[in-house]
Amino acid sequence: MSACQTPVIVALDFPTREAALRLADQLDPKLCRVKVGKELFTSCAADIVETLRHRGFEVFLDLKFHDIPNTTAMAVKAAAEMGVWMVNVHCSGGLRMMAACREVLEQRTGPQPLLIGVTVLTSMEREDLAGIGLDIDPQVQVLRLAALAGKAGMDGLVCSALEAQALKAAHPSLQLVTPGIRPAGSAQDDQRRILTPRQALDAGSDYLVIGRPISQAADPAKALAAVVAELA
């Protein structure tokens, strides 16, 4: 497998294997990793991960596990056995849940995926948090959950680029994975707390998840190359 040379992760947010592979076949695994989320994984199961890995891609399995500690840890173990490069869980599952996931990975031999915690979804603003009983600014909740993740030994966090600078300052060892990235001139779609790729890296993000600006471009390979050029 050729190691990816950029921080770009392209979201394969498609309902079918055929559609996902149609895009993947236009992308260079040296220029990006790929993200498999709930829709595609539910449709295709582990086969899509194996297929993408055979095409040379490192895979971020974005299923945001959130359950009791043992159940979540076993799901993370299963993901590791698929050979994924990165897997995530919801930090709101708590310290014991995240620590159980860390422990199960450390008990394995061989390569371990990066274990990433999800703080506050980038679609959520203060009014959304208030609706679920958290009448606080999203960044406050992000910092609370980040502290738990650090204590549990997580490798990093999924966060908005707008939270990246504060998180790097508070937790410099955590790798930051940022969705909601939109190259200049792109539509915001349903993401709210967004920055451009260059802005996100400058703010402290380590990996950038980009979906529709590449997947729905007339020429996805050209769109990916433009993002990589922006980061050079």
UniProtKB/Swiss-Prot annotation:
One of its GO terms (cellular component) is cytosol. Belongs to the OMP decarboxylase family. Type 1 subfamily. Keywords: Decarboxylase, Lyase, Pyrimidine biosynthesis. Homodimer. Pfam families: OMPdecase. This is Orotidine 5'-phosphate decarboxylase. It comes from Pseudomonas syringae pv. syringae (strain B728a). Substrate binds at residues 13, 35, 62-71, 122, 182, 191, 211-212. GO terms for biological process: 'de novo' pyrimidine nucleobase biosynthetic process; 'de novo' UMP biosynthetic process. It catalyses: orotidine 5'-phosphate + H(+) = UMP + CO2. The active site is at K64 (proton donor). Gene3D superfamilies: Aldolase class I. Its EC number is 4.1.1.23.
